Regions:
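Bacterial N-terminal signal peptides
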Residues: 20-30
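C-terminal functional modules
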Residues: 348-467
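Conserved, mostly hydrophobic/aromatic
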Residues: 93, 187, 321
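Catalytic-core regions of glycoside hydrolase
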Residues: 77-80, 99, 121-122, 183, ...
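N-terminal secretory signal peptides that target proteins for export/translocation
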Residues: 1-15
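Short, low-complexity, disordered segments immediately C-terminal to signal peptides
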Residues: 40-48
């Protein structure tokens, strides 16, 4: 939801000390500065992937006697993706038993690159055409497409809750999308400034706006559905302003409206049943988990390891599970996304170590291609595996920054850079027509690492901040 992190002084780096707790379930990890050290080789990967010799059914099949998957809704969203990027992912969603795709509200911003949001203006015909293509492709593949909209974030004119004019301008865009045959919608109010606001009144106002929109949608289509993303979209909502807002929202919100929730935190190492039950009790509505993994907020970071730290029985509390992806690297995002699909389909049998190996095998046909993706994942296991709570956490550059501060560390840093260069070269050789955005990202990381290595004196400072 995008927590836009723009404070890194080195491209792709926004770092914070992370949790030391082991999150990997069946994966054994070694943590140290940056990506960790393992064994006698200080540059040996702390996270290792075992790719099976043969493919196995994937996602993990349901146990005998069980016919229904874990979560009812299982899928992903975009993140300022182009419509062609959404279209490219639909076959993978269908193949791996995902059934839900939501376009990010940033994709319909007036300027998705600069984050200009003039929500009151009619959606351009080119945007509607893109939505129409994605919605049609989803229907053909048996996938539910959901249109998302945010009438406040990055806008110099946030929607006024008591204004009929503002509502009608917002409704015009929902109506245009509904006319394309879309039946699922989202209204988002995440990440807005609420300082000094009457929080309980704000919850009621948001419920009123969502109810009004939902009523309009169902006038046109009695089977229309709406998911609302609240201001306090994380945590147990059991105290303070979060509780006041959430309970006020829940009391007034139409009972047929779903609510998004990201888990115990915003970008969180754990999503627990206890926190989910607490939040659901406060809001008293059906939940869709919006898992902020492997999202990088367009920071240049790569989070390629398996999703970990999600309780195996969350499907008993939440109706749906939606992953938040990398941007703009939608192709390489398929590796962690497939592990999310595996978890969402059969959470009780989910094994992250097995899942990441199977995901790589699904996406690569030859031993050399498998090895290229495996080595890339081991270089960039991601923030969950590395113990960080930041979407901009960059394992490679953090490691280089740490090494150049140590006596004799520059030699090791050169070796690490050489390793990244080798993986990048193999990715280019094995996939000449694929992973273009990932190749650009690796080139940027190599350049940034070289700059750190050549800089005299201490390593460049890296600003660390929480999301």
């Amino acid at each position: 939801m995008p927590r836009i992190l723009r404070t890194a002084r080195v491209p792709g780096i926004v770092i914070k000390a992370g949790w030391a707790a082991a999150l990997a379930l069946s994966i054994v990890l070694a943590f140290a500065s940056g990506c960790g050290r393992s064994g006698p080789d200080p540059l040996a990967p702390a996270f290792r992937v075992t790719v099976p010799a043969e493919r196995a059914p994937f996602p993990t099949p349901l146990p005998s006697g069980r016919k229904e998957p874990g979560f009812v809704l299982r899928g992903t969203k975009g993140w300022a993706w182009t419509w062609d990027q959404y279209l490219a992912e639909i076959p993978y969603l269908a193949r791996y038993k995902m059934n839900f795709l939501m376009s990010c509200y940033t994709s319909v911003f007036t300027d998705p690159v600069k984050f200009v949001n003039r929500w009151w203006e009619p959606l351009p015909q080119a945007t509607l055409a893109g939505i129409g293509k994605v919605a049609a492709a989803c229907r053909d593949a048996g996938i539910t497409y959901c249109f998302s909209f945010h009438p406040a974030l990055f806008s110099d004119r946030p929607l006024r809750y008591d204004s009929d004019e503002d509502f009608d301008e917002m409704w015009r865009n929902y109506a245009s999308v509904q006319a394309l045959g879309v039946r699922w919608f989202s209204l988002s109010y995440d990440d807005i400034d609420v300082k000094g606001r009457d929080i309980a009144a704000l919850g009621a106002a948001h419920a009123g706006l969502a109810n009004r929109l939902f009523g309009r949608l169902r006038e046109k289509d009695p089977e229309a559905e709406l998911i609302f993303c609240p201001v306090y979209y994380w945590g147990p909502a059991d105290q303070g302003e979060a509780r006041l807002y959430t309970e006020s929202l829940g009391r007034a919100l139409d009972k047929d409206i779903f609510v998004f929730w990201t888990g115990d935190g915003i970008v969180t190492p754990r999503i627990t049943r206890g926190a989910a039950e607490s939040f659901r009790k406060a809001v008293d509505h059906r939940l869709v988990i919006w898992d902020n993994y492997p999202v990088n907020d367009r920071s240049g970071a790569l989070h390629l390891g398996p999703v970990v730290g999600r309780d195996p029985d969350l499907d008993e509390v939440a109706y749906g599970y939606m992953s938040n992806p990398l941007a703009p690297q939608n192709e390489i995002n398929r590796i962690p996304l497939l592990t999310c699909a595996d978890y969402a389909y059969n959470p009780r049998a989910y094994d992250p170590a097995r899942s990441i190996g199977q995901a790589i095998r699904e996406l690569a046909e030859t031993p050399s291609r498998i090895a290229a993706l495996k080595d890339l994942v081991e270089l960039y296991p991601g923030n969950l595996i590395s113990g960080s709570a930041l979407t901009g956490y960059n394992c490679v550059l953090e490691k280089v920054a740490s090494l150049v501060k140590e006596p004799g560390g520059r030699k090791l840093a050169r070796r690490l850079i050489s390793r990244v260069e080798g993986v990048a070269a193999r990715l280019d050789r094995e996939f000449p027509d694929g992973y273009a955005e990932t190749k650009k990202t690796l080139a940027a990381h190599i350049a940034a690492a070289r700059d750190m290595l050549s800089a005299p004196g201490p390593a460049p400072s890296i600003e660390r901040r929480a999301p």
